[in-house]
């Protein structure tokens, strides 16, 4: 219905015509959106889904039929719990329901083919895997998953708590099946080419994919991601500077000294402002300027807003890859122009350069 209203009822029979006043159309669309805007509305939709659509009730069918982003569900509950509330499936009780329900919203934006393929392979057989024997890249992908669900890195894959958490996931069959369905859905939705970025070690982060701060840091072997509060992180063991860029900064979230003006100049150049305490003559400033000679790399992760406007949680970052110093002006703070190794795709460019100020 929403699509018909927006498109002008193009599907009505030949010779028929429907026109809504702008105010009436807005009123109807607002009411349709409101029906998905709470748990009760979703329960009602689920209860009548098969009758309304003629389709089997599955997560994919529900999302496709109503043109929903998975986060529209996961901001409230799991799809399985909503189905149980609608008496569409039997009620269930599983050990990880609360933990997984919170994690679903973060997993609903995963868009790396490599990571999703790994998870689809490993999650159905968690109780038959020697995690400590996995190849390095797969260990890192497992860490990314673990920190997403449990909020901290797994320091030791043989640790009793870590194994207990993973085995509890294996025992949560209803929600594990939902997780696998979500991952398959996300894989089908990927509409860009992702590829590895050469960092000198087997890193599972892929170009132009979406990652939370915690996911990307554990993928870079930094196991205390929650300690990172600033927009930069130097990883000396890897010789990597990680930049976390938020393009649209709200006054309530940032102080006057952290309202940095960051944006893409074009598909290859990115304007970035250092921290206000960074002088060009400082070790950090010199490392930025001479990173090639120093043998270090700069990685750029960009998001549009701090908060995910759909869930209210923290928005994830798009990985723009490695960047190289071009020039700078100023000191305390430094205005640096970086050249990206790979150009920004058009769909991301609309977001990264729309905030340029004159």
Residue ranges of model-derived segments:
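Compact mixed alphabeta submodule
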Residues: 309-358
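Acidic, glycine-rich low-complexity segments with interspersed aromatic residues
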Residues: 76, 82-105, 109, 113, ...
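Terminal accessory regions of large proteins
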Residues: 80, 91, 95-106, 110, ...
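Charge-dense, extended regions
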Residues: 133-242, 246-250
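Low-complexity, flexible helical/coil segments
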Residues: 2-17, 280-283, 334-342, 356-358
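Short, charged/polar low-complexity linear motifs in solvent-exposed/disordered segments
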Residues: 24, 36, 262-263, 353-355
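Long, largely alpha-helical accessory region at the distal end of helicase-like NTP-driven motors
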Residues: 2-121
